[in-house]
UniProtKB/Swiss-Prot annotation:
GO CC, alphabetical: attachment organelle membrane; cell projection; plasma membrane
Domain of life: Bacteria
Protein known as: Cytadherence high molecular weight protein 1
HAT repeats, residue ranges: 148-166, 258-278, 300-331, 333-353, 477-497, 959-997, 1029-1067
Region (Disordered): 174-244, 294-319, 365-393
Compartment(s): Cell projection, Attachment organelle membrane
One GO biological process term: adhesion of symbiont to microvasculature
Biased composition (Acidic residues): 179-207, 214-242, 374-387
Keywords: Cell membrane, Cell projection, Coiled coil, Cytadherence, Membrane, Repeat, Virulence
Function of the protein: Component of the cytoskeleton-like structure which stabilizes the shape of the wall-less Mycoplasma. This cytoskeleton-like network of accessory proteins containing HMW proteins 1 to 5 allows the proper anchoring of cytadhesin proteins in the mycoplasmal membrane at the attachment organelle.
Residues forming coiled coils: 1000-1027, 1082-1190, 1547-1621, 1758-1790
């Protein structure tokens, strides 16, 4: 069955033509595959079968099938695997586990790439090895039309195969071929009968096309040149792709060729572009004679085929229709058991449907398709011919064809060549032969050709020979990869021809055949190559430029990935249109590139389109690489430095569209090294679509071809004459290029291959060229490349085997991965024009053609051998690459000067002189074509001295049409599209669909599976739905209503009860009785509810009345009791007076909160004995409550004793510096100046004075508001509000000593009182609604209000005031709502029961339905200052707001407070007065709280009325949320801009902008604020870093001086022979940092760290500097040098120096403080200016708002105007809110700045104190170091698991470092001054320290985690998060916006002797820490 097998093999290959390609994977490439890819490709190699004998044992024991069906292969780790071949799927599998293996990753036992088919024998296959692994063209040996057998029974080709495996006949032999055809047809007829039906398959399909095409064979060339254009255009690529080559259908057809003795088909001609068969001109008569028998045999066969074909329709009907196709290639193959295996199936129409693995044939094989598939074979030939024939006409006197060229050889070689190339894209059972065939090395060596012609048969018989020599050192050697490298090659007769000078080094090991068959195949290839060139020379050189169809096999590395345009996006890096650099200098794209290279931003806007050139006529598909392939690249490379290819790309825009580049080459095939003397390439450019990175592919030069009709390519294909040395190993045949003289009257350029790594758009890139002589091209280049083999010093280059040259690479392929090779003896020499004759031709000689006819001319000259120029993507850095990306517009004229001017080295002529053998081993001039086949590195060979061949590239008048090869060929070699199996067969991993889009096989397989599953599921779903429908049909229709409550209900037994019935129309008729019953039930429920509500209201009213009537008597009685108790308990009346006049005067406060606290504390010195009070309270409870807040702290930002500022209100020391970052904005206690806000007030359990503690603790406002004067100035409009801790401490202060408070107490309250009195009184001022504010931290079990509703005195107070319409307004701010059902109708009741009724203390938020209605009432309200309306009556609003007063809480507290010294009569009036004023305060605070506006802190100068919101218009226009009713109560101007942030609270949903606009506004605001403040803080930090650095430098200088001084002392002491203590020595010369003292590594402290660490930079005294302080301390205290009589003098002298050092340090510290303060003042003033500017706008905005709202109220606006005004108002609100936010943000930054500055100053002062102590010989530092540091560092670092005694540590620090921590507060804190810090520490509750102990150890390592790291600070604190922007800004203002921002004055003292710091700077240490 040999023929059958061969045919099967052929068909299989054709089937996978789109998917697979013979190419052996390079080891490197394989290794590069990552694990996922590898597993995806060939499964997990390591999944072995447990139950099967291990493969390694089976291999050792020889327990494997003899037929080779199961073999053993080894991976790189020597793991053994069973492997077998699955011919059906054409994959290698593990036979037991059935998973796929990638043979390219496996090796045989000798370490050579594994070749399965070397040992794979199919039964009955006589030539099995050759067939399975042979070259593609081998199947055509013996095929009529491809050649003939000569008298020696040797096969002579009548043409050659191009790189697409298209057979190109030799035209000159046509006459002979015709004869041969006739003769052979007869012979064939006889033979055909004996041939298996397999060959017939093609013929069956052939008949129709044949009948059409045969007559056209004789048509004149010009005619079918035109026809070719039309017909070719009509035949879309997809059709060719899907159906196989056109010419395939003529294989076996008589007249087209014949079968040789090997049953290989030999064409006797070729197909032109119109698919017309053109007989070979060169057809050899001898061959014809030799092939007579075959011709006859074949003709008979052909007749038989035609008969069968005619009978086919009849047979289709019969049941055995398919039997006729058994044995027909394309339908299946014979397996190893000689059983026929179908590769598809017949559908019901008897159309053959191939399996999915044969993607190309995946369409039903109808008759039409048979013809198509066969035609596929014919296409290349016909295409070639069309291109060639016109070229004949154009031949000028360029055809200097050596006479010795033998047509036979040419023909035979061309035939073989075509076979080879035709086979490449397909999967054939190719052996290692494929690995070693290199199309690029089609070098013309006539002698070799002759040998090959003669020995073709010999080869086949001797195929086994050479594999026996593997391992024989005479024939080669093993390289470092343990791969066999031959020292020569076997010729056609199987004789080993050694290469000179160990050329084998340059042969990749993969080229070394694994089997003899591979070698023979390669020799056949060489044959083909040689013949090709020979015949090409005989033929017109133009025609060979045709090799563009050769382009099919794209190298592995072609950029035709699934994103076809894989251009280099790096060229856009740095372009601000495409992205930006982030902080880490990393480039961030602002969009993405699509597959076409277009750049879109993230919004989808097209930012950049690469279509800068003119669109080509035909836009390629995304998977079509043609537009990406580099245009013209001339590669001149030395073989020994093949990786250093100089690649040049010529910018197509430089060329005229019409210009044509014609390469005419006349090469002497017998001569070996070709030395092109001139290469004049005339460019023909078509407009180009994209300026995208283009792929450069080498293209071998072919004889000139006219490309005028070429409509497919718009890129100039480059032509590269390749000069190789002769005596070529298997795949490289050298050509002597001395005669290679390309000429062109057009300015020439040297195109160069381009590696895809170096693509840049538009910009040509030049990688360092390293050739000996490089001259800039001007308009024309003559290139002499003269190399003789004797001149050449061949340096072998080892090539790894995975991408084998012989694996059917293409001349066009340069994109093959190749290992990086060191360049040897290559220098980049300055341009030398010696040997380069630059001729400038006249432009007039350019012949332009219409643009439409030229698309992508491909210039290839196959007469010139093309070297394998593999440019590895990874190693392409070493390649010299000149890229000029072609961008051609129709109008652009080609001007080579444009190219030359763009870059100095854009065009490079490489001159390789003869006389420098070590520099030149042969010049490879490769042309980069549109597609390139995978090729390995350039391999150098030594060769006999060559004769000269000439290639003349000459301008032609006529443009030749280049035939298009299948588009997919260009993807062969691209790993994204497939891979090479171990046979070097290209395996596609997918297929191309009708749109030429590549569909991944993985996808397709899974898709098909998915489709099957989907269909399965669909069918199941359909079945289910049918079943369901059937069920539904059976079910009553009404079942679907079960469960619908409109139709019934479930009873208690869960049985469905219908509420009605369905009538005959299936309409539901409800049961009337049920409906009525349900309605009645509902009505009853509602009625009950209403009754209940009414009863509730009545009960409430009655209760209020009763309570109010009882109130007076009860309270009088209570007051009497309390007065008696207090009189008994109180010792001095004076003490009570202190309570009455508690507050100090309101002088300008540094920080009012702090001042109050301090003044309170001061009065503790008065000896008020409050032991009784204390005994009343449980101390533990008090402490627990005190630190309630503390225990809730998580995520501490600041815990350090240095910077945790104190709130010393009373005995206890409280950390107020713990803040959660988010809580800063929401829950932080308000320490600063701000408006008064009422906290919920709760009544103490008892009325005794013992509850005063809780009372004070609970609400400090009561204390502050106790005694108010009515004569205070309006300036003090802001009140001090204490937080919980302040209350606690205040209470303690009162407890302790209250005497001293008397004098100043009134003054603090005055501001509060005055504010109220300066406003015209309104009843609203007295309202104190209970709001749901943050709950008091005091435990409920401690304080339980005893009385809820007693406040009769208040009623009297309120009766004095006028009723207001507002009184009826009942705002509902509380969640608990007992008023939810009360209609807004109670004013009459109020009037009636006014004295007695009090509302319940819970106020529920208004129902949304009533909000607008009630707001409308509120809108009439003007604050009393502006329009006090005495006529207003008291209404429900007053009732609601009075609740806290009414329920007696406030009264009880005040009563308890005053009852000690006030008689009952007095106390009533006093309390009334106090309550009145307090109500005023609370009311104001309430309004403010509700409106988020400081409505009461107005300047008396204000004249504008306050804005009033009027919502009486149609609610359709105004949809207000809860807060909006108050939004307009805006303060237009403030007393102090920096003090009051006028904030209009606008919730997000009120801003009438779209969400996007709002986000945009917020983003802009964020960006502005962040940028501005970050600039300032960066400036601040940099200044301080600079200061710190200077400080440290000075410091180090002092330290060094001290050490040198110490050194002198030490020497003197030693000279006096005094004993030195080890301590001294170690301290002076520390051998290593002491763990306890120098934790941070002293040695490195002076180097600035990359991060700014406040801990180490702000303080001179830190762990990095302890050594200096200790040193000073020891020196000062005479510890280092024992004082004796001998060294006393020296010690004193030394002490003087030490004191000078101390002085210097103090000076440095002093200057540091001055600089830090100066820097701080600058930044602070800048921030304040920002705030001021922002605040100036707020009143303007407010006034505009007022005006607009006045217009809304006062004017009757039409609907349009009304809407416009509303929009304006919303915009103003948004602006107001944004500016307010900005102010809040800046205020926060001011606060941060203060915090940082406070740390800095604190540390400087701390250092200063330490130095002062040292100088005064106070041994503080050693105590500090021994104790504090020990507990800090040893516990933290040395023994991190030991729990530290924080309490002891705390006390140590407090005792020993008073000034360091809190010296700044001494003047504020007399208690600290008098009692010392131990007092504080002793009074800290136990929980304080237990909390500390839970803190992470490292917290103490930095002073403040927020600020410990500069970059962290900047990152975290200058990014406004959305939370900040949307949360309650009034809270932020409360924290940051309310305090008066002051510049701390700094008064530098010039008196150095007075080193004490001025204590005048007043940073708010308290609030931020």
């Amino acid at each position: 069955m040999p023929k059958m097998i061969k045919g099967t093999e052929f068909i299989v290959a054709k089937k996978t033509k789109n998917k697979k390609k013979n190419h052996f994977e390079d080891i490197q490439t394989t290794n590069d595959i990552n694990e996922e890819e590898s597993e995806a490709i060939f499964g997990n190699l390591y999944d072995g079968a447990d139950e099967v004998l291990p493969a390694s044992l089976a291999y050792e024991n020889g327990q494997l099938p003899e037929d080779g069906s199961i073999q053993v292969a080894f991976d790189a780790d020597d793991n053994a695997y069973y492997i077998s071949y699955d011919p059906e799927n054409e994959i290698f599998i593990e036979p037991y586990e059935k998973y796929e293996l990638d043979v390219s990753a496996l090796y045989d036992a000798e370490g050579n790439p594994f070749d399965f088919f070397a040992n794979y024998h199919v039964e009955g296959a006589e030539t099995s090895q050759e067939e399975e692994s042979g070259e593609y063209w081998e199947q055509f040996v013996g095929v009529e039309g491809y050649g003939y057998y000569d008298e020696n029974e040797e096969w002579v080709w009548t043409g050659y195969f191009d790189e697409d495996n298209k057979f190109i006949p030799n035209e000159e032999e046509k006459p002979a071929e015709v004869e041969a055809l006739e003769e052979e047809s007869e012979a064939t007829e006889e033979v055909v009968e004996q041939e298996p039906q397999e060959e017939v398959q093609a013929e069956e399909v052939v008949e129709e096309p044949v009948s059409q095409e045969q007559p056209e064979e004789e048509v004149a060339a010009e005619e079918y040149a035109e026809a070719a254009q039309e017909e070719y255009e009509e035949q879309p690529e997809s059709e060719q792709e899907g159906s196989g080559e056109y010419w395939e259908q003529f294989v076996g057809v008589e007249g087209y060729g014949y079968y040789d003795e090997n049953n290989d088909w030999v064409w006797t001609g070729y197909f032109d572009e119109n698919n017309n068969f053109v007989p070979d001109q060169y057809y050899d008569e001898d061959a014809a004679v030799a092939g007579d028998e075959q011709v006859e045999e074949y003709s008979a066969q052909q007749e038989q085929v035609q008969e069968e074909y005619e009978q086919q329709p009849e047979q289709e009907g019969s049941g055995e229709y398919w039997e006729q196709f058994v044995g027909v290639e394309g339908y299946g193959y014979y397996d190893e058991n000689n059983d026929w295996v179908w590769t598809g199936y017949f559908d019901e129409n008897n159309n053959f449907v191939p399996d999915q693995y044969y993607d190309e044939y995946a369409q039903p094989v109808s008759e039409e398709q048979y013809s198509e598939s066969v035609s596929e074979e014919q296409e290349p030939a016909s295409e070639e011919q069309v291109a060639e024939e016109p070229a004949q006409v154009e031949e000028v006197a360029v055809e200097q064809v050596p006479e010795e060229t033998q047509p036979e050889q040419v023909q035979e070689k061309v035939q073989a060549y075509e076979h080879v190339e035709e086979q490449q894209p397909e999967e054939v059972f190719a052996d290692a032969i494929d690995e070693h065939y290199d199309e690029i090395t089609h070098v013309e060596d006539k002698a070799v050709e002759e040998e090959q012609i003669q020995t073709d048969n010999v080869v086949s018989s001797d195929e086994i020979n050479w594999s026996n020599y593997v391992g024989n050192e005479d024939y080669g050697y093993y390289d470092e990869n343990n791969e066999w490298v031959w020292k020569g090659y076997f010729n056609e007769y199987g004789m080993f021809i050694p290469q000179e000078e160990d050329y084998t080094d340059s042969i990749p090991v993969d080229e070394q055949p694994v089997e003899q068959t591979a070698d023979l195949a390669e020799q056949n290839e060489e044959e083909v190559i040689e013949e090709t060139t020979a015949s090409d020379e005989i033929v017109q050189v133009e025609e060979e430029v045709e090799s563009e169809p050769v382009v099919p096999t794209v190298s592995d590395d072609l950029v035709a990935l699934e994103q076809p345009f894989e251009f280099d996006t790096q060229q856009f890096v740095g372009n601000i249109d495409f992205g930006y650099y982030d902080e880490s200098s990393e480039w961030i794209w602002t969009g993405h590139f699509d597959k076409d290279g277009k750049f879109f931003d993230f919004d989808g806007n097209l930012v950049y389109s690469p279509q800068e050139g003119v669109k080509p006529v035909e836009v390629p598909k995304p998977t079509d690489l043609t537009n990406q392939i580099p245009q013209n690249a001339l590669v001149v490379a030395e073989p020994d430095v093949f990786s250093e290819d100089t690649i040049q790309q010529v910018d197509e825009s430089q060329f005229d569209v019409g210009e044509e580049l014609v390469v005419r080459g006349l090469l002497n095939p017998a001569s070996t090294p070709v030395q092109p003397q001139e290469l004049n390439i005339k460019p023909v450019f078509e407009e180009e679509k994209l300026n995208l990175p283009v792929l450069a592919n080498e293209v071998s030069l072919q004889p000139q071809v006219d490309y005028s009709k070429r409509s497919d390519f718009d890129q100039l294909v480059t032509q590269t004459p390749v000069v190789l040395e002769d005596v070529v190993a298997d795949d490289l045949i050298s050509v002597d290029t001395k005669g290679f003289v390309p000429e062109l009257s057009q300015p020439t350029f040297a195109p160069k291959a381009v590696s895809q790594d170096q693509f840049k758009l538009v910009q040509p890139v030049v990688s360092q060229p390293k050739f000996d002589q490089i001259t800039h091209l001007t308009d024309e280049i003559k290139m002499d490349v003269n190399v003789t083999s004797s001149d050449v010093d061949v340096q072998p280059i080892q090539i790894n085997p995975s991408l084998e040259v012989a694996s059917e690479p293409s001349k066009l392929d340069i994109f093959v991965k190749k290992p990086a090779v060191e360049l040897k003896k290559i220098e980049f020499i300055e341009p030398v024009s010696e040997k380069i004759d630059l001729q400038i031709f006249e432009q007039q000689e350019i012949v332009t053609k219409p643009v439409s006819t030229i698309q992508k001319p491909t210039y290839t000259d196959e007469t010139v051998s093309v070297s394998v120029n593999a440019i590895d993507e990874t190693t392409s850095e070493t390649d010299t690459i000149v890229q000029v990306t072609p961008t051609t517009s129709e109008a652009s004229d080609f001007d080579i000067n444009k190219i030359l001017n763009t870059k100095p080295v854009e065009t490079i002529t490489v001159e390789l002189p003869k006389d420098e053998p070590k520099l030149v081993t042969g010049v490879h001039v490769s042309l980069v074509d549109v597609e390139a086949k995978p090729v390995e590195e350039i391999v150098k060979f030594d060769s006999p001295k060559p004769s000269v061949s000439e290639v003349v590239v000459e301008k032609e008048d006529k443009l030749t049409l280049v035939e298009e090869e299948p588009f997919f060929n260009k993807f062969i070699g691209n790993e994204q599209y497939g891979y090479y199996n171990n046979k070097n067969v290209w395996i596609w991993t997918g297929y191309f669909d009708d749109q030429n889009n590549f569909v991944s096989d993985k996808d397709s397989k899974t898709q098909k599976v998915d489709q099957l599953i989907e269909e399965f599921n669909k069918q199941e779903a359909i079945k289910k739905t049918e079943e369901v429908e059937a069920k539904k049909a059976s079910e009553p229709f009404y079942n679907k209503y079960i469960g619908n409550k409109q139709f019934g209900y479930y009873n208690d037994k869960n049985v469905w009860i219908w509420n009605g019935y369905f009538d005959e129309n299936d309409q539901f008729v409800p049961d009337q009785s049920w409906t009525k019953r349900s309605e009645k039930l509902i009505e009853d429920e509602l009625q009950k509810q209403r009754i209940h509500e009414l009863e509730l209201e009545l009960a409430q009213a009655q209760q209020a009345i009763l309570e109010s009537t009882k109130l007076k008597d009860q309270e009088v009685a209570k007051i009497k009791e309390e007065v008696l108790k207090v009189q008994q308990e109180a010792i001095k009346a004076k003490e009570v007076a202190t309570l009455r006049n508690f507050v100090p005067k309101g002088s300008p406060l540094l920080n009012p909160a702090k001042e109050v606290e301090n003044s309170m504390i001061v009065y503790q010195e008065d000896k008020l004995e409050v032991n009784d009070l204390r005994n009343e309270l449980s101390k533990l409870k008090t402490q627990r409550e005190e630190f309630d807040n503390f225990s809730k702290i998580r995520d501490l930002d600041v815990i350090n004793l240095y910077n945790a500022s104190t709130s010393h209100r009373g005995m206890d020391y409280v950390f107020s510096g713990f803040e959660k970052k988010e809580e800063q904005f929401v829950k932080k206690p308000l320490h600063f100046l701000e408006e008064v806000k009422a906290d919920p007030v709760q009544v103490a359990k008892e009325e005794t004075i013992s509850n005063l503690d809780q009372l004070l603790k609970q609400d400090p406002h009561l204390l502050l508001a106790k005694k108010t004067d009515k004569s205070v100035s309006p300036q003090a409009s802001l009140t001090v509000l204490a937080d919980q801790k302040e209350v606690e401490l205040t209470q303690q202060a009162v407890r302790k000593q209250a005497e001293a408070i008397e004098a100043e107490r009134v003054d603090v309250i005055k501001p509060l009182e005055q504010v109220q009195l300066n406003q015209s009184r309104s009843l609203l001022d007295d309202l104190t609604p209970k709001f749901e504010v943050k709950p008091s931290l005091i435990k409920d079990d401690v304080i339980q209000p005893k009385y809820n509703d007693d406040l009769e005195p208040i009623e009297q107070l309120q009766f004095k005031q006028e009723r207001s319409l507002l009184d009826d307004y009942m705002p509902k701010f509380d969640d608990q709502g007992l008023f939810s059902k009360v209609e807004f109708k109670l004013p009459t009741v109020n009037k009636e029961y006014r004295p007695k009724v009090e509302p319940i203390d819970v106020i529920k938020p208004l129902e949304p339905v009533r909000i607008n209605k009630e707001r409308s009432l509120l809108d009439d309200y003007l604050p009393p200052k502006l329009n006090a309306q005495p006529t207003f009556e008291k209404t429900e609003l007053d009732l609601g707001l009075e609740k806290p007063l009414a329920n007696g809480e406030l009264y009880e507290e005040l009563k308890a407070e005053f009852s000690t010294t006030i008689t009952p009569a007095d106390s009533k009036d006093m309390i009334d007065q106090l309550l009145e004023e307090t109500n005023d305060l609370i009311t104001s605070s309430t309004q403010t709280r509700s409106t988020k506006i400081h409505s009461f802190s107005k300047s008396p100068l204000k004249t504008e009325p306050e804005p009033i919101l009027d919502t009486k218009f149609d609610d359709k226009f105004i949809e207000l949320d809860e807060n909006q009713g108050f939004d307009q109560l805006i303060v237009e101007s403030d007393d102090e801009l920096l003090t009051d942030v006028v904030q209009e609270q606008v919730s997000v949903n009120q801003i009438a902008v779209t969400n996007e606009e709002y986000k945009k506004d917020m983003a802009e605001l964020k960006q502005f604020l962040e940028k501005r403040s970050e600039e300032l803080f960066k400036q601040y930090f940099s200044k301080f870093e600079e200061l710190t650095k200077l400080q440290m430098e000075s410091f180090n200088q002092i330290k060094n001086e001290l050490r040198s001084e110490m050194n002198e002392i030490r020497d003197e002491v030693r000279s006096n022979k005094l004993a030195l203590t080890s301590e001294i020595t170690e301290e002076i010369y520390p051998s290593a940092p002491k763990v306890s003292r120098k934790q941070r590594g002293v040695h490195g402290f002076s180097e600035p760290t990359s991060e700014f660490d406040f801990d180490n930079s702000l303080s001179l005294v830190n762990e990095n500097n302890y050594d200096l302080y200790e040193l000073l301390d020891r020196i000062i205290n005479y510890e280092d040098v024992p004082l004796t009589s001998s060294n006393l003098f020296k010690a004193e002298e030394y002490q003087a120096k030490v004191k000078q050092s101390v002085y210097n340090i103090k000076l440095i510290l002093k200057n540091s403080e001055a600089e830090a303060t100066k820097n701080y003042n600058y930044i602070l003033s800048t921030l304040k200016n920002e705030i001021t500017l922002l605040q100036k706008d707020l009143p303007i905005i407010s006034s505009q708002l007022n005006k607009l709202q006045h217009d809304l109220r006062a004017k009757q606006l039409n609907r349009g105007d009304y809407k416009f005004v509303q929009e304006q108002i919303q915009e103003l609100r948004a602006e107001h809110a944004n500016k307010t936010r900005a102010i809040s943000f800046y205020n926060k930054k001011v606060s941060d700045l203060k915090s940082i500055y406070a740390q800095q100053i604190r540390k400087i002062k701390s250092d200063y104190k330490k130095i002062s102590d040292l100088a005064n010989k106070r041994k503080v530092s050693s105590d500090y170091i021994d104790q504090a540091l020990q507990s800090f560092e040893t516990a933290r670092v040395s023994q991190p698991n030991i729990k530290r005694n924080y309490e002891q540590l705390y006390r140590n620090q407090l005792q020993q470092n008073v000034n360091a921590n809190y010296g700044n507060f001494r003047r504020y804190d007399p208690l600290i001054e008098n009692h010392g810090y131990e007092y504080f520490s002793n009074h800290q509750p136990r929980e304080f320290f237990s909390e500390l102990e839970s803190i992470d150890n490292d917290i103490f390592s930095s002073n403040d985690l927020i600020y410990s790291n500069r970059n962290t600070y900047l990152d975290e604190n200058f990014r406004i998060n959305d939370y900040e922007l949307t949360s309650n800004f009034n809270d932020i203002d409360a924290i940051y916006g309310m305090d008066k921002l002051r510049l701390p004055p700094f008064e530098p003292s010039n008196l150095v002797n007075d080193m004490e710091f001025n204590s005048s700077f007043d940073i708010d240490f308290d609030t931020d820490f």
